[in-house]
Amino acid sequence: MKLVIGLGNPESKYSGTRHNVGFDVIDRLSESFQIPFTAGKGKYHFAKINWRNTAIVLLKPMTYMNLSGHAVVAAMNFYKIQRQDILVICDDLNLPSGTLRLRAKGSAGGQNGLKHIIECLGNDEFARMRVGIRLEDQPLSSFSSFVLGKFSEDEKKTMEKILPVCADAALDFSVNGIEHAMNHYNKPAA
């Protein structure tokens, strides 16, 4: 069994924001399998899907981004899932909009949801998919209001192209592992 976690903030006012791109990827998977989310045994919503003989739990923490680790640990304990079987999907202000980057492990890189998961798990040895949200003309100093802002119409078009790729990469991770997914979905920056 694999656990694929999309990071975001639970209130409807955050829907469509750059910070909720992890939720967007997970929602895309849930919709494509026509499996709705239900409340879990912790502060999370989940949907269970099967793909190529692999059970996959899709998870949306309902704890807010900065406390995501609590929901992740609760789900890992409930489903008895090990670190090597999780993939965390989040936004990344350091990557250009419309790109993705898979890694087997690594630092939080300024992403507070990842930071809290690392704190709760005690190390950074879990797979993650970072989805780029940075605009070319966006100064990195004003990141807080930017990440919590809604996508512009142009950004929405870009996201509509990358979200299915992210969903496919999450399925690839689930069936074939992080190295395979990295080899197929990590592309050099243009």
From Swiss-Prot:
Known EC number: 3.1.1.29
Compartment annotation: Cytoplasm
Keyword field: Cytoplasm, Hydrolase, RNA-binding, tRNA-binding
Keyword Hydrolase: yes
Site (Discriminates between blocked and unblocked aminoacyl-tRNA): 9
Any GO CC annotation of this UniProt entry: cytoplasm
PROSITE patterns xrefs: PEPT_TRNA_HYDROL_1
Family according to the record: Belongs to the PTH family.
Summary of subunit composition and partner proteins: Monomer.
Function per UniProt: Hydrolyzes ribosome-free peptidyl-tRNAs (with 1 or more amino acids incorporated), which drop off the ribosome during protein synthesis, or as a result of ribosome stalling. Catalyzes the release of premature peptidyl moieties from peptidyl-tRNA molecules trapped in stalled 50S ribosomal subunits, and thus maintains levels of free tRNAs and 50S ribosomes.
Name recorded for this polypeptide: Peptidyl-tRNA hydrolase
